[in-house]
Design a protein with these regions (language model features):
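A structural signal for hydrophobic secondary-structure junctions
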Residues: 61, 65-66, 71-223
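Transmembrane alpha-helical interface segments in multi-pass membrane proteins
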Residues: 303-309, 313-358, 390, 394
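N-terminal Sec/SRP start-transfer signal
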Residues: 1-31, 325, 412, 417-424
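Alpha-helical transmembrane segments of integral membrane proteins
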Residues: 19-29, 281-301, 335-346, 387, ...
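A hydrophobic alpha-helix feature that marks transmembrane segments and, especially
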Residues: 5, 30-35, 281-319, 327-332, ...
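Short helix-loop junctions at transmembrane helix boundaries
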Residues: 345-392, 404-407
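Peri-transmembrane interface segments
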Residues: 40, 234-297, 306-308
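Alpha-helical transmembrane segments
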Residues: 28-56, 354, 361
Length: 424
């Protein structure tokens, strides 16, 4: 029966071409948009984790309340012992201390006078310790534009766009003017080892990357850090695991009234990420519902048109004794065949487009000029195992619904009127 119905569909293009084309377009768009949203979500999570939040972040309670202001006077102290404790409690995670700071970067001329200066967003990380993961987390080798990565504590990296505005070359001296942990003025000289471009507008506008040892000396933060970031070993964020780790850590300090006691927060609870990710997932589900609804309506209309063209055929089949239920069932089987074929073609086309966008990306830097989010300027799709099957939901559901609704007209045909219909 299935082979017979399939041959009938292939021989009569009026019954198959338009419905298959509708399913192909709908499934292709569903697969592509799903992968696009998947890629955007991964982009947000990956960029935010690497540059800002980690998968989990440990701060003092007082610092956490004012984290947007980067209050280093409320930073964690006794960081070495806390790091040892974290390695013992969570040996499968990567832990790294960081210091955020703001200030002015002053570029002197040959006489030592100010030639140019600009506001800088500083980030002190562990660049030089043996086995440090920070160069890999920041992908410094890939981000390097000019010069080299720091090899000594007094060397820094600055963003390429910032360096061009200040006319700074690798090897030049730069003076950081900032504030110490105690609130006094901090002045320290550094050498620009190289320039970087992360492709993240929030970092590329005016970032400075320094080794944490030199920053601690400059900011009077010995054995202190504003934040300790934790990453899963595979660098893939898993919210349930992160929440479990945070709950376990925080339970040990629930009864501690000290404002400087450490507190762990997850990526999803920082910088509005939970709302952003929830919105993206809701949009992904909305895409499925919309395409199922639209395709069902289109295929319903196509089924009604097909019923008009096949009005006489259905009448003959009824006159020959074929039951209405059997005819209705064959119409649904034909629709499911159309849905399966259209879904396979649409999925293949959608995956091809997604793989291309995953490899090459789409530069949206012109839209991110004033962005404060830590998100890459190059948006990429991300193909996952779900991508291969997501198209079957709208492809099969829409064809089934369309055929089910349009085929109900069969039950309104009166057997007593068949001969009169055939005579006309």
């Amino acid at each position: 029966m299935i082979k017979f119905l399939f041959k009938g569909l292939m021989r009569d293009r009026s019954r198959s071409f338009f419905p298959i084309l509708t399913v192909v377009i709908g499934v292709m768009l569903t697969v592509f948009i799903y992968n696009w949203i998947n890629g955007a979500e991964f982009n947000f999570i990956d960029s935010s984790a690497r540059f800002n939040t980690g998968h989990v972040k440990i701060m003092s309670r007082a610092y956490a309340r004012e984290a947007d202001q980067v209050p280093n006077d409320l930073a964690l102290v006794g960081v070495r012992s806390l790091m040892d404790k974290l390695q013992e409690l969570y040996p499968d995670m990567i832990w790294t201390p960081r210091i955020r700071f703001g200030g002015l970067l002053d570029i002197p001329d040959a006489q030592g006078e100010t030639r140019d200066q600009g506001p800088v967003m500083g980030l002190a990380v562990d660049l030089l310790s043996p086995g440090s993961h920070e160069p890999r987390i920041f992908k410094l080798e890939d981000a390097l534009v000019r010069g080299r990565v720091p090899q000594r504590a007094e060397e820094i990296l600055i963003s390429e766009d910032f360096a061009r505005r200040l006319n700074v070359q690798p090897g030049d001296t730069a003076t950081l003017i900032s504030v110490t942990m105690q609130g006094s003025m901090a002045i320290a000289n550094f050498t620009v080892a190289g320039t970087i471009r992360f492709g993240v507008e929030a970092m590329d506008r005016g970032a400075m990357i320094a080794d944490i040892a030199a920053a601690r000396t400059a900011l009077d933060m010995e054995n202190a850090a504003g934040e300790i970031l934790g990453f899963f070993a595979d660098f893939l964020y898993r919210d349930p695991d992160a929440r479990q780790a945070a709950a376990r850590f925080n339970s040990a300090y629930n009864d501690d009234p000290d404002e400087f006691a450490p507190v762990m927060d997850t990526l999803s609870n920082q910088a509005g990420m939970a709302d952003l990710l929830a919105m993206m997932r809701m949009f992904s589900r909305l895409v499925l519902v919309v395409f199922i609804a639209v395709m069902s309506i289109v295929l319903w209309n196509a089924g009604l048109m097909g019923s008009l063209r096949r009005y006489g055929e259905i009448g003959v089949r009824l006159a020959m004794g074929e039951t209405k239920s059997h005819i209705y069932g064959t119409l649904i089987m034909e629709a499911l065949m159309i849905g399966a074929l259209g879904t396979l073609i649409g999925t293949a086309v959608g995956l091809a487009e997604s793989y291309y966008l995953q490899a090459h990306g789409l530069d949206i830097g012109f839209m991110m000029k004033n962005a404060s989010l830590f998100v890459s300027n190059v948006m990429r799709a991300k193909v996952s195992p779900v991508s291969y099957g997501i198209g079957f939901i709208p492809g099969m559901a829409a064809t089934f619904l369309g055929a089910s609704i349009s085929g109900l007209g069969i039950y309104r045909r009166q057997t007593s009127q068949l001969m009169k219909e055939l005579e006309t």
